[in-house]
Amino acid sequence: MSVYLLCKNPIANLERLHFPYTPQIDYSQDVKHEIYGLTHTNYQPYAYTRSENPSINLSCKFSAHTESHFVMAEQALRFLRTYSKMNYGRTDPQRGLPPRILNFFAYGATVFNDVPVYISKFNMVFPEDIDYVTGTFDSKGQLVSGSRIKETTTGVQTRDPRIPSTQVQNQDTNGATSPAGEVKNNQTYEISLPVLFTVNISLLVQQNLHKTVNEFTLEKFATGELMTKGYV
């Protein structure tokens, strides 16, 4: 019962966004009708105009209580930030490309299977009343070590005394240390994430118009044949 977002032409190593906990999915379909403004009648007839693209909204929980969950949460944030942006900049050979179309999978072949989507919005709250976890990454983005940071009511960070202080500092090649979170000589860097948090993601379904014109029939849709090909 896997739920995930897939990028078929990924940037760097951001190919798939897994959800460690089953997300809440809010799926809706709007059907538009226009009214005929006839006079001298109590009941105006409607005329069908179009069926809107379905909308998919996810409410996803992430945690950072283990190294694997911490890495998954960090990659999720990086995934969402990356695929909500276009290629840009003079040194980018693909500058001008819009954000990537992703493919959404959930609950089997005729529910959400290979559905082409854009990220239209995402948001995350960094709570003030929860513990934070700090992880150290190397210059290649690989997790080196993790340590627990406790957020006090005064807003001052205090280190868990069970964790060696070297795990909450960056160390350069000469043995010098720098405050947590600061990049030192491009050797390592630290980030902190809530031990438990929620990310809300809004997706827009974006079908290929050429394919829909040439392969869509309501009969094929009703039998489930087209649902296996990304139609919802």
Each model region followed by its residue ranges:
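Compositionally biased, intrinsically disordered low-complexity segments enriched in polar/Pro/Gly
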Residues: 1-232
